[in-house]
């Protein structure tokens, strides 16, 4: 990573970074239109991987860059692109990352949003191709969306160059509306490495009947991580991601606990007797009655936990706001066992049915505890949506 000659300054990290990235390519986010893709295509904005810099790598159009970079504008206007969220939802914040764009970053951006129906989108699929600009036909198709009139979630604001200490810019959003599409404006031109949209997925639960079997914890259905003890190698929000994990980095993995005994001992059921554990608290997308649980340690072959347990509780929205002010995940939550301590194994899908569960009540939150440490790729809570009692 490039270092700026000035002294590094640590910046506070906003709370919304614990939420899901609704625009990531891994959850279906896509670029529908971009005014210009000369040096690097807009699709790079939504990549899940971290940006990289390849010294000495050039294309016929210029320096290869891992992001979206437009040509130096020599005509009136500014550059912009339209992004379709992979998971429609309520947006709580944005992250614009200009890593490695030091003398060619976009100096200013603004962000607009809309909630569109599928039939309103008439844009043709894009080609991921550098050295191009939008054609007249593509501009005409994009103009039909009237995106310049979409709601502003972020007015024009400055970005900073892509040095280590200044590349990440965070913007909080105060909106309770559901959005499906964004217009990212850069002024007037330049590059951004990654663009992330943090929020909570929101589906239409009115179309879901009481007998519909759903993964109540999935990010697509509105599940979200609220807190955790450790996320050294991978964030627990990955537990509720789409599909199975693509690698270890796509799961929740903690550091090795330093309080583990010098010599490990297990009980008759194979559960290690250790003092330490790690935990993550998540909110279901909809309260419900959980009847089946899946714990997937896919890819964690030498670093899965020995055991896992899940506690649950039911909190109404007003109670959620009240306990949020306590600053911890014990006071006011009234946790009850949902899944007793269960031994889990490396690189395996574990399925638990209702006969294995200790709680048969409507719940809204879960606390996942692993011991002593390690990694889990996915957790699914299957059941039926129900109103809170």
From Swiss-Prot:
Record key words, sorted: Hydrolase, Purine metabolism
A Pfam family the protein falls into: Allantoicase
One GO molecular-function entry: allantoicase activity
Annotated signal peptide: none
InterPro entries associated with the record: Allantoicase, Allantoicase_dom, Galactose-bd-like_sf
EC number: 3.5.3.4
UniProt pathway annotation: Nitrogen metabolism; (S)-allantoin degradation; (S)-ureidoglycolate from allantoate (aminidohydrolase route): step 1/1
Catalytic activity: allantoate + H2O = (S)-ureidoglycolate + urea
Coiled coil spans: none
A GO biological process held by the record: allantoin catabolic process
Tissues showing expression: Abundantly expressed in kidney and liver, but at much lower level is also present in brain, testis, intestine and lung.
Top enzyme class: hydrolase
Function as written in the Swiss-Prot or TrEMBL entry: Utilization of purines as secondary nitrogen sources, when primary sources are limiting.
Family per record: Belongs to the allantoicase family.
Identification of the protein by name: Allantoicase
Organism of this sequence: Xenopus laevis (African clawed frog)
